[in-house]
């Protein structure tokens, strides 16, 4: 699923969601394991429009969408160096569940029960 956040017909944010589980997350012990997760793969906000709450609104949309579609949790990851995203996820009630390493670096995994 790919959803756009628009302002006056201009895209200023996107969110990409896919049904889980994600194969990259096999090493993670999820708190809601054995359930049906929705996985966030991308959250992007126009740099000129950051700090306006758009990321939070997109995340709230993802949580509502996931719950309405019958998913039991939302799982995601972010680069260890991406403190802005990590702070957002933690402020929204996401729990750190572990780390993974991919060819692009190290990532922190987060989860929230829906």
Which residue ranges define each predicted feature?
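Conserved acetyl-CoA-binding loop-helix of GNAT-fold acetyltransferases
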Residues: 42-45, 51-64, 87-91
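C-terminal "cap" of GNAT-fold acetyltransferases
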Residues: 34-37, 72-86, 90-92, 99-114
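Alpha-helix boundary/capping detector
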Residues: 1-3, 66, 85, 92, ...
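A broad helix-preferring feature
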Residues: 13-18, 86-89, 94
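Conserved phosphate-binding and hydrolysis motifs of nucleotide-dependent enzymes
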Residues: 9, 13, 53-55, 93
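Conserved GNAT acetyl-CoA-binding A-motif
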Residues: 59, 66-77
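Acetyl-CoA-dependent GNAT
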Residues: 1-48, 59-60, 100, 113-114
